[in-house]
Amino acid sequence: MTGPAGRAARTTSGRRRATRAVRPVEPVPPLAPEEPAPGIDREALTRTIAMVNDKGGVGKTSLVANLAGQFAAAGYRCLLVDLNRQANLADDLGFRDGPADDRGAGLLVSVVAGTPLRPVEGVRPGLDVVAGGARLVDLVPLMVSRVQEQGREAFLALAEVLAPVAGDYDLVFVDCPPETTILTDLALAAARWVLMPTKSDGGGLVGMRLVGERFELARELNPDLGLLGAVLFATGSRSRVVHAEVREAVEEAFGGHSPLFTTSIRHAERTAQDARRLGRLAHELEQEVAAQPAWWASLREGGGSARRLSPTAASVAGDYRDLGVELLTLLRATEESTTESARLDARPEQEATP
């Protein structure tokens, strides 16, 4: 992402923001401001986005990896936190079984001990990761025990260890697992925003409704939490009917709000297979596709049987670029609106009176 949409403008707090026109769809706003939980720097978490849907296979990990990868390539500092025990993020970014892959041990230790997360730096330039994996199996019974002892306050454990490092980044994405609600509740208690991928089939929409129920419950603990929007993933149709149906489902799940992103990510099975097999992101595949010799040249040189990368990688990468621009535009609009509201609230009563 280059130009105005790919670079961020500094806010008064020193964080960076995108510079493009305002998107017409409004996100679900946070609740009325309340006192933040003691010891948690909510300001540091204002660019923390939880990728949530209780249904698996709807694109959560793909969106996290590709959006963060493109933002990092454009000069943003990004952090990814993987709460998934399957750790598919390690496959998408190509660090499975490498030095960065601790299988969730570091994340587990931080949450148990209450010490700041220690991201693995430089998985891509500007892109750091807190890995997930099999060790997170041990986190579930631990959280069950803590909730029994402390109540829902126990779900602030991730916020407490993420906030000390989140301020070092322009964007933080939390990849949430399907169905393991306790780990997702940790993310909802830490995040400022929810971004929700879904497919247009029944399973994805049911998963979205389940998230809607827990979203409202999470806001009792984290009133800063808002819904940034829903994204149609792996869709073969861009018809208005499909978008209208999904928009209606979002509205039903989130109490009358229907923020559906204009950009959707197209279905491209070969590109998805190439990406996970090679540990490449869509924009990286796009570059490799452009560099590979023409099919007839490979055939002439005796390489006709070698597997070629799918040319649809360029189209998929374009979808992610468009979604990234739309996401940054919406973030900037909401941040400016919040800043203006705070400024008006801070004015003396006599100045605020016309």
Where is each model-derived feature located?
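P-loop NTP-binding core
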Residues: 2-354
